[in-house]
Structures are given as structure tokens and as C-alpha cells.
């Protein structure tokens, strides 16, 4: 499965994109995003460390394997629907 994110916020704050993680063994892929995801990836002291950050640039589309561990690089921003983080997300299957 592939995932796509299109950033749709004009002039977003710096460091408001997407971060991909890898673990101590160099693995980028996880076992899905079940309840263990937050505990194993996002909590401090985790074996999963930030590996790559993609900046949030208006109208940029990023494509990645859907099983890569990822999260926003910072907390969501804005205090209303008009000023918050806006993205279009999609998923698709393709054989390469």
C-alpha cells in the first residue's frame, strides 16, 4: 500500500511537515499503526528515532510506503479550521 499527503496550508510554520522514523536496527517499516504505535514510536526513549523530515510546502505531494513509521514533525498548528494544518491524504495499491 502507498500513502500520499498533499500539504494545503499556504505559508505554513517551519518544521510542520512529516517525519519518518527508523529503529536501532535500521528498519524503517513497522507492524502497522495499532495501539502499540504510539508507545513504540512517539514516546521519548523509544528505539525509533527520527530519520528523515519532509517540509510542509504548499501544494507539495509526498508519496511513501504506507507501513513506514511517520508522524507530523511538530504538533498541529493553528487555533481554528482556517489557520490549522490542512492536508489531503490518500491511499492506493500498486504493483511495481
Regions found by a protein language model. Give the residues of each.
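Catalytic core of non-heme Fe(II) oxygenases with the double-stranded beta-helix
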Residues: 1-96
